[in-house]
Amino acid sequence: PPSSGGGMPVYNAQTETEMYSDEMLELARVVQSRVLEILNITGAPSNKISAEGMRPKVEDALDQALREIRHRIPGSIQIEKFRAVLMDDLIGLGPLSPLLRAADISEIMINGPDNIFVESNGIQYRTGVRFNGEAHLQSIIQRIVEPLGRHIDAASPMVDARLDDGSRVNAVIPPLSLDGSLVTIRKFAAKKLTDEDLIRFGSLSRPMAEFLKE
C-alpha cells in the first residue's frame, strides 16, 4: 500500500475487487487447504499456524501450493498480491489485516461476509474486500477475541473488547444477528488530530477553530 507522510501504511481505496471475486475466493480455499495438508494440520487455520514462529514454515508451504496451482491464477492477478492476501488469511486477520494496518482508517464496520465498510478522514465508504463466507468471518472474529481471553459462540453471541493497541472491538454473531455476523472496530488513533486536520476533513470551520482557541 502507499504510505502517509509519516511512513505509516495507508489503505488504497481502489482495492481491486477482482482479487475478492467468487473465482479468487474459491481458489484461495483450494490453496489454503493445500497449505494445511502440506503442514499436516487438520481443520481451519487457527492458532496452530498463526503463531509468529510458524511463519517461515507457512510461507514455504504457501509457495509450494502456489506453484502447484499457478496455471489457474488469472493473468490479471498479481501473484505477490494474492500471496499477501493468503498470508493474511493464514496467520493474520484475513481481509481485515490491510485495513488495520492503514493509518488513514479510523473505523471498520462489517455487516456479514460481503459488506465491509471503513471510515477514512471522516468519510465512510464500502471496500472491495470480502470474507470467504460466514464461517471465514466467524473464524477471524475468534482469532481476534481469543488472545484477549474472550469467547464468542451461539450461547454467548456478543463480545465487546479492547485490543492491545487500544482499539475497541464489538462483535455480534448469529443467532443474535440475523443476517450474518456484525463487527465494529474503532481504531485507536496513533496520531492526535489537530485543528488543521479537522478543517481539512470538513469537520470544523476555520472561524469555529479560532473561536474555540479564544
List PLM regions with ranges:
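P-loop NTP-binding catalytic core
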Residues: 102, 110, 115-214
